[in-house]
């Protein structure tokens, strides 16, 4: 697809978004900023003959690697049926998650073929750049990487996965993706300018260049602005409500909860730049998502092996473990857990509470009215970490949820208001 046509289509999408968010100033401002960037791009692609004549022949249509990556991130031309891009499952307008909830209740993502579904919930791409490369520490704890099982070392390797996954973007091989890239004259020129004239001489080299560009875009501040109420609180720009403050104290307390055992990276609870994950892998006993198994056409007895599906791991002791996700934007990026089994954030907190309270009410899933369900993999559950906190009463559960909502980026705060309005109705 020519770059000017792609920009036109992208521009149409943004105008539609601005209409949708007319009542949400933060999101409308976000869409407006994107509109101006695309308008600039459109002007570049419709420059006069005299302007083109005075430009250097090798001038890149993209100002830098991140700009190229942004174009690639939104390009549906890189999928088999030209219907799916990175942004389809990681939409920047909804917290870089998949906003499509009409299939499998949003637990799994629909592929480019319009029928295939994955087995895991698409994680948010926000703040993903801070995950270290996958490795196993000397103490045997697996850490980092991308995807739920850490199988990609970094963002670039992660970006190379979905285009070739038959149930995602569905392209047969790297060469087919590169051929799609070469349909766009701006890509041809831009890749040469940013990666060298011989970048197109080898399909693997060109494909690798594509993944590096997408990673460069994902490393930008748009994915990790650190401007939530919590961040503003640390800078003295926001005063927490009593409930939010109680939740903050509980979250960082090693006496009353176990939250920060896995969801804290920094050594101080007041350190800026906290990602709210230590990137370790654990099995927390998540039950099977029986309700969605029919949607993915798999037996309800199907077991996801988690970390054991990572080619770098062959020890059964890692079976059923998943990377601890960031809690940044957690309130607006449900459903939750690797299989999307819980729809509501409060349910997640109550699920953790079941390990420290044997009261009947805490052994029941409020979304189903039934017991929580057997864990998908029982033998590797991190009981030591899960059982080290106190039981939470209703007030403390509400407080922790209130605090978690303060981790929402400023641009997504209107989504919280929409959630509240939807629950009220």
Regions found by a protein language model. Name each.
Residues 2-70, 166, 172-245, 249, ...:
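Post-cleavage N-terminal segment of exported redox proteins
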Residues 155-172:
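Conserved nucleotide-diphosphate donor binding/catalytic pocket of glycan-assembly enzymes
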Residues 361-381:
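Short glycine/proline-rich, acidic loop/turn segments that cap or connect secondary-structure elements
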Residues 29-158, 225-364, 415-425:
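Short glycine/threonine-rich turn/loop motifs
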Residues 166-171, 301-305, 366-373:
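Noncatalytic linker/hinge segments flanking ATPase motor cores
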């Amino acid at each position: 697809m020519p770059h000017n046509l792609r920009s036109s289509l992208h521009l149409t999408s943004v105008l539609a978004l601005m209409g949708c968010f007319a009542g949400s100033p933060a999101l409308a401002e976000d869409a407006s900023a994107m509109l101006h960037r695309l308008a600039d791009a459109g002007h570049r692609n419709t420059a006069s003959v005299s302007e083109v004549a005075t430009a250097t022949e090798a001038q890149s249509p993209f100002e830098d690697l991140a700009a190229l990556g942004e174009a690639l991130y939104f390009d549906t031309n890189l999928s088999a049926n030209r219907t799916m891009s990175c942004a389809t499952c990681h939409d920047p307008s909804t917290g870089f998650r998949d906003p499509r909830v009409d299939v499998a209740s949003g637990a799994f993502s629909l592929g480019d073929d319009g029928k295939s579904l994955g087995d895991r919930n698409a994680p948010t791409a926000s703040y993903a750049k801070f995950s270290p490369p996958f490795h196993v520490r000397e103490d045997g704890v697996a850490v980092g990487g991308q995807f739920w099982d850490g199988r990609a070392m970094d963002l670039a390797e992660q970006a190379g996965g979905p285009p070739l996954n038959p149930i995602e973007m569905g392209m047969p091989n790297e060469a087919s993706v590169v051929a799609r890239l070469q349909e766009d004259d701006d890509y041809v020129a831009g890749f040469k300018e940013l990666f060298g004239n011989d970048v197109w001489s080898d399909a693997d080299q060109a494909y690798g260049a594509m993944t590096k560009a997408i990673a460069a875009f994902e490393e930008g501040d748009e994915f990790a602005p650190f401007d939530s109420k919590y961040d503003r609180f640390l800078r003295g720009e926001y005063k927490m409500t009593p409930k939010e403050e109680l939740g903050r104290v509980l979250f960082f307390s090693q006496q009353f909860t176990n939250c920060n055992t896995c969801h804290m990276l920094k050594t101080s609870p007041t350190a800026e730049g906290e990602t709210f994950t230590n990137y370790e892998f654990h099995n927390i006993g998540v039950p099977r998502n029986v309700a969605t198994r029919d949607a993915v056409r798999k037996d309800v007895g199907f077991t996801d092996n988690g970390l054991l599906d990572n080619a770098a791991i062959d020890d059964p002791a890692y079976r059923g473990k998943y990377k601890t996700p960031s809690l940044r934007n957690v309130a607006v990026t449900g459903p939750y857990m690797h299989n999307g089994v819980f729809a509501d954030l409060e349910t997640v907190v109550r699920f953790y509470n079941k390990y420290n309270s044997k009261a009947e009410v805490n052994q029941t899933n409020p979304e189903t009215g039934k017991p929580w369900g057997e864990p998908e993999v029982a033998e590797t559950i991190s009981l030591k970490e899960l059982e080290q906190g106190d039981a939470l009463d209703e007030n403390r559960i509400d407080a922790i949820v209130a605090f978690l909502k303060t981790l929402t980026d400023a641009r997504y705060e209107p989504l919280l208001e929409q959630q509240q309005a939807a629950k009220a109705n």
